[in-house]
Amino acid sequence: MAFALSLPSLPKRYQPAAIWSLYVIGLCPGLWYFYLAATGGLGFNPVKDFEHLLGIWALRFLCLGLLVTPLRDLFNVNLIAYRRALGLIAFYYVLAHFTVYLVLDRGLILGSIAGDILKRPYIMLGMAGLIILIPLALTSNRWSIRRLGSRWNTLHKLVYLVLIVGVLHFVLARKSITLEPVFYISTMVVLLGYRLVRPSIMTMKRNKRARPVRT
């Protein structure tokens, strides 16, 4: 059942500019942290801190992208035009997070990378999330939607698997359950739970619309 809340939507002629503005604003935190890392503003271990912050922002944008559908279904807040941008920004942060790990943290030394993975297996979860995200990012365009048809929706449901491995990667990397991991675990549970009950909610909404209005 949807709540009686509706926000005015932006006229379509302004949407492209709004989407590009979202890309610029969304990538600003990464650029800011890069500047801080390069100028000594991230403290004692700037590489680790930079790597961690990129991962956090990847998780934030991933969650924001997955919130678009519940907001539309339950509150009539239609941000569907921005979902692709939110997903791609999340992908860019995951890619940057992984690149910083490989290049700055491990220095592209294969032995060091392999040893680190054996010592910290949760790194494999992060790598799995990136691998799954690659085809999702590559098919986040109208041509792929037309080409793949119904298979596109099936493919992009894998984003929920990315959410699971991303949250697990984050929680295991923290090595302790504090407020921040609890927040992302809770967000994951809510998003996955809504995905499970959504068919029932949408059926109820369709039945309500089909019901004759009493005069």
UniProtKB/Swiss-Prot annotation:
Give the CC-aspect GO terms: plasma membrane
Q: Which residues cross the membrane?
A: 17-37, 50-70, 85-105, 121-141, 152-172, 177-197
User: Where in the sequence is the signal peptide annotated?
Assistant: none
Which one Pfam family would you cite for this protein?
Ferric_reduct
What the record notes about the co-factor is:
Binds 1 FMN per subunit. Binds 1 heme b (iron(II)-protoporphyrin IX) group per subunit.
How does the annotation summarize its subunit structure? Heterodimer of a catalytic subunit (MsrP) and a heme-binding subunit (MsrQ).
Entry's family note: Belongs to the MsrQ family.
PANTHER family, from UniProt? PROTEIN-METHIONINE-SULFOXIDE REDUCTASE HEME-BINDING SUBUNIT MSRQ
The identity of this protein, by name, is: Protein-methionine-sulfoxide reductase heme-binding subunit MsrQ
Source organism of the structure: Agrobacterium fabrum (strain C58 / ATCC 33970)
